[in-house]
Amino acid sequence: MYYLLILVLLFLAELFYFRIADRCNIIDKPNERSSHTKVTLRGGGIIFYFGALAYFLTSGFEYPWFLLALTLVTFISFVDDIKSTGQMTRLLFHFSAMAMMFYQWGLFSLSWWWIVIALIVCTGIINAYNFMDGINGITGGYSLVILAALAYVNKEVVTFVEADFIYTVICSVLVFCFFNFRKRAKCFAGDVGSVSIAFILLFLIGRLIIETEDFSWIVLLSVYGVDSVLTIIHRLMLHENIGLPHRKHLYQIMANELKIPHVIVSLAYMTIQTLIIVGYIYYQQYGYIFLIGCILLLSAIYVLFMKKYFSRHIS
């Protein structure tokens, strides 16, 4: 009953946001770099923050430093959706938020170089998740797969977080998917959505890694990770400015050049990540070997795909 109520309230909150976005003209206009062709409401992913906030308010204010950190990145990302902000301003907010999350993790008791490594890895993951938000359904669907896996691990393998937190966030993702996981999306996540859900997943996976002292759990993000890293390497090889927008991710080639429906591409990413997670949990005793094997296999698929289809890409 609790989750049904949360689901209804989040659904109503999303509808209320749509009215605000429509009235304030918070929209995403298609351009030559877009994978969509119609004007669509932007920022629907703010519902992820509301999901985390709902848990915070009903749990006796659990994880306060994390919630404050999430509020910071959500705020600056929403502002960026409305009016572009400077890179230094965004970095200041993101680094401040990550410092708070590290404090919630208890990371400051470790050596300083662990903190530096964590900062680099976390920054990379958030940016990658943001870059991968380019077609209908991919952010919501991929996040749903990871959250479902985390819920299973939390219940059956090792308890690393309050279960209600994961389930409440899942409710928010389901609401977003209702409006986005379709041929003609009602809304896009926006930076506020992709960054906030990335931050939430990062917090959960970070707690899991700290609890188990096993970094191989990063396999939960392997599909996004390989696509993001190899696309950056590819663009560097092409002597491009990696800070500029583009349409060279594997999923973008599938959706734009091969004309595969967005929902099908998103389902493909979800399915591959699901299979990897199931395999990892089954062969968990070989965690790092499995992780390396997945990275190599996904990298091979990426390279072969690009060799065959990248020539169709129109810059």
Protein language model annotation of sequence segments:
Residues M1-V229:
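"…together with the soluble PPM/PP2C metallo-phosphatase catalytic core" -> "…together
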Residues I210-S315:
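C-terminal membrane-associated helical module and adjoining short loops/tails
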